[in-house]
Amino acid sequence: AHRGDWRNFPENSLEGIENAIKMGVDIVELDVQRTQDGVLILMHDETLNRTTTGKGKVSEVTMDYISNLYLRNGCAIRTKHKVPTLEEALLLTKGRIMINLDKADRYFDEVYALLKKTGTVNQVIMKGGKSVEQVKGQYEKYLCEIIYMPIVSLDKLNAEQQIEQFCKDINPVAFELLFIKGNNELPKKIPAMLKGKSLIW
């Protein structure tokens, strides 16, 4: 469920997550931003303008300011729903649904601390577009506990080699694969290459 059940509730809202769970969804995708005072919240955009009644960059306002705002729905209409913190979302989903965290790897240490605090380490998928070397250098101490999903652009020249290297060094449960070029042959080739090794998102 992309940003929760965004068709019936505001994106990245607790109510949208709850409804996705009730619908029987296996994985809910959520986005993370950090406030000026270091609170991790659910928000796709870097600014509050599109999805809330507030204005400005998330990174330049406090959680106190955000707590007084209301979320807007897909038609930009104000709702009664509030902006949730990541911790609130983790507590809501604990033991109930897998979470695919987007835009969160830049806050890996802080996210991990919240996962440990809430007991949700085993139900969260962290992902990012970093190289194998960067992932090993920055996150290796977490990889034995956290599900990490590499994001690989198949339009890049070394995409196939990058996937092979990830399989060899990290053995990820899944890959998120992106491509735009219509003449790219890799989308046809990769499923066979990853069969029995990693899933494709």
Protein language model regions, located:
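Phosphate-group recognition and catalysis centered on beta-loop-alpha active-site segments
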Residues: 1-201
